[in-house]
Amino acid sequence: MKPLRFAVTPGEPAGIGPDLCLLLAADAQPHPLIAITSRDLLAERATQLGLAVSLLPVAPGQWPDLPAPAGSLYVWDTPLAAPVVPGQLDKANAAFVLETLTRAGQGCLDGHFAGMITAPVHKGVINESGIAFSGHTEFLAELTRTAQVVMMLATRGLRVALVTTHLPLRDVADAITAERVERVTRILHADMRDKFGIANPRILVCGLNPHAGEGGHLGREEIDIIEPTLARLRTEGMDLRGPLPADTLFTPKYLEHCDAVLAMYHDQGLPVLKYKGFGAAVNVTLGLPIIRTSVDHGTALDLAGTGKVDTGSLRVALETAYQMAENRP
């Protein structure tokens, strides 16, 4: 059987991404895991952290078939443009960050990697360098030529996908269209089936308005857009429940019988998930032809090089990527 290799990108070199990768090396992984970053950066950070990690070089055409031993980490060396000081951003390294993402994403497309796991980048410093960059998700959508992707956050026991993501609240209602709801629901359903191995996923769908519109008295999006769209998709055999009031849906009675929740907007679904899985949640990009998971936290510049970082989110991101790859047909 072909080995399942995975790429991990540490993201912003002055942040905690390199620290997280080094800390993960303490434990043997079930699959070969390759850090795409500067070997010198990892060596310097390991010294700063007082960690003894063996950095094993790999390159295209020399991919490992077996996991690295505990205390070791495979590294595909990617050169920095400028030296790195933990906690100090340098726009000179912006292109380096994007090169690591390109190598990981293209490696997935070419079949070298079964999936990629990303640590946080700093969008601001990349844009300050003169490179337009709105985030991992958009970057990978462009790289893979994917028209529509879906943001889903997950923790143990709960998955929440979003119809809209980073929009001001005043713009959300206008963005809830039948076309968008259908497109996002189809992607969520397909990836639950094909990447998570759930033959007939049960999806709970939030309404947009309080009390799911209260029969049209508190808004008509449920009546005019969401319910008709769900009804059409149910005729294809999709198990869709809703639209339900969010304050009803996010209760044990409902959640224990669902595989995923579809929320209409960012702050409708994610506060519940982050409360349930604080420090142990993962961001999954659905709709891509590749597997991509990510931590759910930022670069934490103030913690870089201190040894005071929590690997919980990265471990869940790894577990999720492994699970998705193992479930793919």
Curated annotation (Swiss-Prot):
Its EC number is 1.1.1.262. Keywords: Cobalt, Cytoplasm, Magnesium, Metal-binding, NAD, NADP, Oxidoreductase, Pyridoxine biosynthesis, Zinc. Substrate binds at H136, T137, K274, N283, R292. InterPro entries: PdxA (IPR037510), PdxA_fam (IPR005255). SUPFAM superfamilies: Isocitrate/Isopropylmalate dehydrogenase-like (SSF53659). Its main location: cytoplasm. Disulfide bonds: none annotated. It comes from the Bacteria. Pathway: Cofactor biosynthesis; pyridoxine 5'-phosphate biosynthesis; pyridoxine 5'-phosphate from D-erythrose 4-phosphate: step 4/5. It is found in: Cytoplasm. It is an enzyme of class 1 (oxidoreductase). A divalent metal cation binds at H166, H211, H266. One of its GO terms (molecular function) is magnesium ion binding. One of its GO terms (cellular component) is cytoplasm. It catalyses: 4-(phosphooxy)-L-threonine + NAD(+) = 3-amino-2-oxopropyl phosphate + CO2 + NADH. Binds 1 divalent metal cation per subunit. Can use ions such as Zn(2+), Mg(2+) or Co(2+). Its cofactor is Zn(2+); Mg(2+); Co(2+). GO terms for biological process: pyridoxal phosphate biosynthetic process; pyridoxine biosynthetic process. Catalyzes the NAD(P)-dependent oxidation of 4-(phosphooxy)-L-threonine (HTP) into 2-amino-3-oxo-4-(phosphooxy)butyric acid which spontaneously decarboxylates to form 3-amino-2-oxopropyl phosphate (AHAP). The active site is located at the dimer interface. Homodimer. Belongs to the PdxA family. This is 4-hydroxythreonine-4-phosphate dehydrogenase. It comes from Pseudomonas putida (strain ATCC 47054 / DSM 6125 / CFBP 8728 / NCIMB 11950 / KT2440).
